Design a protein with these regions (language model features):
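Short loop/turn microsegments at loop-to-beta-strand junctions
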Residues: 31-33, 44, 156-157
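N-terminal nucleotide/polyanion-binding subdomain common to many enzyme families
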Residues: 27, 126-161, 167, 175-176
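Short, compositionally biased leader-like segments
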Residues: 1-15, 128-133
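Small-residue (primarily alanine) positions within well-ordered alpha-helices
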Residues: 16, 20, 57, 61, ...
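Conserved small/polar residues in nucleotide/adenosyl-binding loops
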Residues: 159-166, 180-209
Length: 209
């Protein structure tokens, strides 16, 4: 039976989610992720993922905390990654730093992670829990989650009406990794009653926590 989350757990996870939001428009194709390290009720380090290829949220928080990370609890908006990409696995960094507990808002659906991050932490003796404020965490990365789960881009269709000649224009917006930060372009019109077209955008690539 899992241990219920405390009021403090909710507070610090909400903080991690707010940090993750700072990656809006910059993390593509990676997901937006925030991390808060807490020891004895005090925040000792925090961070958020800024751009693909740059340090992940957990690594930034660990660097800020230094030795204070030992025995701390890490609140992460997405399960720590467990695979080697352009950056090393965050799960290994948390273990090496001596973090005692990891709370993830949700598990990472990326096939390269898919529970392996939390499993590796648990096997190393780190207490793990997942599912705190999960719905809010999912809202951060609709494009990334759709790609990982269905192999499809996240697309938003917008309509606007030109009152001058009552023509309707459409704009297709294709979300990338964090989903939702990249967009498409629009078409233009010509003289003498000429027409225009909509534009579109797409996303690709994988992501890490």
């Amino acid at each position: 039976m899992s241990t219920p989350f405390s009021a403090a757990d909710h507070e610090f996870m909400a903080r991690a989610l707010r940090l993750a939001e700072r990656g809006l428009y910059t993390t593509d194709p990676n997901p937006r992720v925030g991390c808060v390290l807490v020891r004895d009720g005090q925040v000792v380090g925090e961070g958020w993922h800024r751009r693909a290829g740059e340090p992940h949220a957990e690594r930034i928080a660990l660097a800020a905390a230094g030795e204070a990370a030992r025995g701390a609890t890490a609140y992460v908006s997405l399960e720590p990654c467990s695979h080697h990409g352009r950056t090393p696995p965050c799960s290994e960094g948390l273990i090496a730093a001596g973090v005692a507990r990891v709370v993830a808002a949700m598990r990472d659906p990326n096939p390269q992670v898919a529970g392996e991050g939390m499993s590796g932490l648990h096997e190393a003796g780190v207490a793990t829990q997942a599912g705190l404020l999960e719905a809010a965490a999912e809202e951060l990365n609709p494009g990334f989650l759709k790609r990982m789960r269905e192999g499809l881009p996240y697309v938003c269709l917008l309509y606007t009406s030109d009152a001058a000649d009552d023509r309707t224009w459409g704009l297709l917006w294709g979300g990338g990794g964090g989903g939702d930060g990249g967009g498409g372009g629009g078409g233009g019109g010509g003289g003498g009653g000429g027409g225009g077209g909509g534009g579109g955008g797409g996303g690709g690539g994988g992501g890490g926590g």
